[in-house]
């Protein structure tokens, strides 16, 4: 769920919805290793013989000190995990999974063949009964950094941590359809959920004590009410709630769900609890300021990670089967397109994070007592794994790592890595001054100019700083609500679609100018509602590829290749008039003079441009609004200084149009955003054909088939006129040219394959 705090953090058109395999996905950077076909042998030989030397300094935004492969949450903490762990399976530069890691898979990217290796092989078999089996085999030469061998028991232990009913990290393996998983998890619940569902007036203390019940409800009535009241007050401040007693209005604006009129702050807190299964750490996502952990007692907070058996005990997950010291199978009840991505999970050492005396596979004991992850939680300050580097210490904002001589793809070429907390303002000057070797400044035209000034010349390669750009794993868009922008109250009618396409056609024409002005060559205009970094994104060379909203109401192309900008703007307006007329508007002499019943002559698009026009899409919208004004139609661009107001406006369903951005995961599943039952289908799109395509794409693992389905689905979305894809921006990594051997940096970096993916091969000058 989105909240005001998240909205503020994401207001700068970076991302609205973050989807990731946090806690396990990031470690994939150490799960697959790659070398170009032309020098793979030489690289492999060098990596096993070269001596580690020197210290490499990396800039990090800030640590939370949760250095655990199971519980790391912040990006910087996850970076530490990436470098100290290996994942079971990895992905290539396109985000596609590498299933033959032991022998390696060769795949082409940007004209170069790269061979990817990893810790394991995985054979996926779709069975006749509808189940799917994942046959996993580990390399037999893997070692943890302390010299202990990596076996399938470590994998099984790690899986059971992620699947435990009390696990409250950010990985979501527990949501997959593994055979027997529901029975395993449902045979135990958390103490917090049990007490909450029993109710404050409960008199049956069979499963918990009266003292525990009283402590829980005392915490709810005190800290819980304060937590909810902060949300209400925040909504009152932004105008989304009437007053301090308007819990119902605030719950709706905060996207928590519905509460009846007269509901209290306590009712709101109980709604939040129900939304998150009374997992207090998960409920922290809804904070309006104060952490829930600061409002309720520590012992009560721990109730949400305390397991209680209910019903018949189920000691194991039937779908997880050990077949050898280095092999296992995992079986799901049905095909799940996301299951394979969950296998990017880290392989954590049982002997370090668990209790070896409690591991007995044959007797359903997996390294800890079910419902008790205390031994795992106790190891969050010093990670151990089989990754490129070993953790030394964390002190004064710096994480110190040492080269792992046992790393399966060869010992790193640098002896030490210091990961240093760095302010944004120092990420460039630090590299210039020589105190930082690699950093990731927020990239913009101003940053590019600053680097050019330091280097004395423009370009990616300079004498002081070398820059490497890659596409950001997300995109910016402009949306229209089908519920609020339609003709005659029917969002799905052809007239309603034509109305929205009339508006979008004009806005689309001004994207190039607006994005070039804001980003220069650090962003590109996109034409389909998907990040260009996804394997499912249509390519310009694909059959049927089209510029978004570039045809008129009769399906004819609006533009020609020799058109100048002004000609394109005029052509877009002419096409818009055709759409308006088809929607039922009265059009005469190039002017719109009247709207049909249930439609208007004016609509509004909300944009979070800080109240001063600072947004990539602001110029695009204002230019389009000015153009539409010339034909008698008013498009109001509402620049909202308070990001929470923007997010509340469309999450509550009130906005007619808005501007935001999505971030994508490896898997391009569209259910959440575009299915009629999707939780974040703010467009209110409801199309049977689209729903069927989305579900069909979930029912196959054939990427070519899925890509075709997704393209057809995206064409339906565009035909509804509810979304205009606008831009794909770049993000940068900068290197000290003087300190880092630039020739040893990973080539062809992508969001799925960064310089850290091959950090063991990087050398210092």
Which residues make up each language-model segment?
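Acidic-aromatic pocket-rim loops
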Residues: 171-184, 188-198, 462-464, 471-474, ...
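Extracytoplasmic/peripheral linker and loop segments enriched in polar/acidic and small residues
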Residues: 218-222, 226-227, 233-268, 285, ...
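Periplasmic binding protein-like
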Residues: 58, 147, 431, 436-441, ...
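Ligand-site clamp/hinge motif
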Residues: 405-452
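Long beta-strand-rich cores associated with HINT superfamily self-processing modules
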Residues: 735-765
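Append "and occasionally in soluble cytosolic enzymes with long acidic Gly/Pro-rich linkers
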Residues: 400-402, 494-626, 763-764
């Amino acid at each position: 769920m989105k909240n005001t705090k998240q909205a503020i953090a994401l207001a700068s058109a970076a991302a609205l919805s973050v989807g990731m395999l946090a806690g396990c996905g990031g470690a994939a950077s150490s799960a697959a290793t790659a070398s170009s076909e032309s020098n793979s042998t030489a690289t492999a030989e060098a990596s096993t013989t070269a001596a580690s030397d020197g210290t490499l300094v990396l800039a990090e935004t800030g640590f939370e000190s949760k250095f655990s492969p199971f519980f790391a949450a912040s990006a910087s903490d996850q970076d530490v995990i990436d470098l100290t762990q290996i994942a079971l399976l990895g992905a290539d530069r396109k985000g596609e999974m590498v299933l033959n890691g032991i022998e390696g898979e060769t795949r082409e990217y940007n004209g170069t063949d790269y061979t990817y290796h990893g810790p394991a092989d995985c054979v996926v078999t779709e069975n006749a009964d509808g189940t799917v089996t994942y046959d996993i085999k580990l390399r037999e030469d893997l070692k943890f950094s302390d010299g202990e061998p990596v076996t399938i028991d470590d994998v099984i232990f790690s899986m059971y941590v992620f699947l435990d009913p009390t696990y409250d990290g950010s990985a979501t393996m527990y949501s997959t359809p593994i055979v027997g998983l529901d029975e395993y998890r449902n045979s135990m619940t958390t103490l917090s959920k049990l007490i909450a569902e029993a109710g404050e007036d409960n008199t049956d203390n069979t499963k918990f004590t009266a003292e525990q019940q009283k402590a829980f409800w005392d915490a709810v009535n005190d800290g819980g009410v304060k937590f909810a009241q902060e949300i209400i007050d925040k909504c009152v401040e932004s105008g989304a709630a009437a007053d301090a007693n308007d819990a119902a209005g605030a719950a709706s604006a905060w996207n928590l769900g519905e509460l009846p009129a007269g509901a209290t702050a306590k009712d709101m807190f109980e709604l939040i609890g129900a939304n998150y299964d009374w997992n207090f750490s998960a409920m922290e996502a809804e904070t309006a300021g104060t952490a829930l952990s600061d409002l309720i007692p520590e012992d009560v907070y721990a109730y949400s990670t305390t397991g209680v058996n209910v019903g018949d005990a189920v000691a194991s997950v039937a779908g997880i089967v050990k077949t050898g010291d280095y092999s296992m199978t995992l079986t799901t009840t049905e095909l799940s397109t996301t299951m394979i991505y969950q296998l990017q999970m880290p392989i954590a050492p049982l002997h370090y994070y668990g209790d070896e005396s409690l591991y007995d596979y044959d007797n359903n004991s997996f390294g800890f007592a079910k419902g008790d992850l205390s031994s795992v939680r106790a190891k969050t300050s010093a990670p151990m794994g089989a990754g490129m580097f070993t953790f030394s210490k964390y002190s004064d904002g710096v994480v110190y790592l040492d080269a792992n001589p046992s790393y399966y793809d060869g010992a790193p070429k640098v002896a030490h890595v210091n990961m240093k907390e760095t302010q944004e303002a120092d990420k460039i000057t630090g590299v210039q001054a020589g105190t930082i070797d690699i950093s990731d400044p927020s990239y913009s035209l101003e940053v590019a100019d600053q680097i050019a000034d330091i280097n004395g010349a423009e370009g990616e390669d300079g004498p002081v700083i070398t820059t490497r750009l890659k596409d950001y794993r997300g995109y910016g868009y402009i949306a229209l609500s089908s519920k609020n922008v339609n003709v005659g109250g029917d969002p799905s009618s052809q007239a309603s679609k034509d109305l929205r396409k009339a508006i979008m056609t004009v806005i689309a024409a001004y994207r190039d100018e607006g994005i070039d002005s804001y980003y220069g060559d650090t962003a590109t205009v996109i034409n389909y509602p998907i990040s260009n970094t996804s394997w499912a994104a249509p390519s310009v060379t694909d059959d049927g590829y089209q510029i978004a909203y570039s045809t008129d109401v009769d399906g004819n192309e609006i533009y020609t290749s020799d058109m100048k900008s002004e000609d394109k703007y005029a052509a877009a307006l002419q096409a818009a008039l055709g759409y308006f007329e088809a929607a039922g508007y009265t059009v005469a002499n190039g002017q719109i003079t009247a709207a049909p019943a249930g439609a208007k002559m004016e609509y509004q698009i909300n944009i979070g441009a800080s109240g001063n026009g600072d947004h990539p899409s602001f110029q695009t919208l204002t230019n389009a609004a000015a153009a539409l004004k010339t034909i008698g139609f008013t498009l109001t661009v509402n620049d909202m200084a308070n990001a929470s107001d923007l997010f509340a406006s469309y999450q509550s369903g009130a906005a007619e149009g808005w501007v935001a951005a999505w971030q994508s995961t490896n898997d391009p599943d569209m259910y959440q955003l575009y299915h009629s039952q999707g939780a974040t289908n703010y467009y209110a799109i409801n199309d049977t054909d689209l729903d069927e395509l989305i579900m069909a794409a979930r029912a196959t693992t054939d990427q070519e088939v899925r890509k075709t389905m997704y393209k057809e689905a995206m064409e339906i979305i565009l035909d509804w006129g509810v979304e205009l894809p606008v831009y794909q921006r770049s993000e940068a990594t900068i290197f000290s040219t003087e300190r880092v051997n630039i020739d040893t940096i990973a080539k062809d970096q992508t969001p799925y394959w960064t310089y850290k993916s091959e950090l063991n091969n990087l050398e210092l000058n």
